[in-house]
Amino acid sequence: TLGLSMMVVALAQARASGAVQGAMAATEATVEGPFFWPGAPEVPLGADIAEGVPGEPTLYMGRVTDVDGKPLAGALLDVWSGDGDGKYDVQLSAEPTMKARGRLRTDAEGRYWFWSIRPTYYPVPDDGPVGDMLRATNRNINRPGHIHLMVSAEGHVPLTTHIFVAGSPFIDEDV
């Protein structure tokens, strides 16, 4: 199930990227996951999107470029993560609080930076077929700490990816 989901994402990304000027995807795509929620607020560069969730304050920064390394000014990043206890806002209430979520645009050099928390590992929901499969294959149910980014820019194929916390438990066993 998990391998097939990732294969579908990889093939779709390759097909979509190839349709845009014969380009290859420079960053591997991943599944959106169950915790994405549309409508996060757009915030300025440097904002703190954590809004008081538990966890270690962390500055995230990077650069969005095209496949040739040219900066993508004005690219939109939709960011979301769990908190320092391994929970997403949508797991804690019926409606998302939009904490540890935000949308921001890159500057003229394609750079972005924002504050949030350093997310920790968490177990995937294992009460359905995914849990059955993980148990049957003797795989770990935990995901290492990570943040999600959905990146879109005019003339480019949207990309959903994630950035893992270095040294996070289970980093070598991600489901």
Descriptions of predicted regions:
Residues 5-175:
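Beta-strand-dominated extracellular/periplasmic modules and repeats
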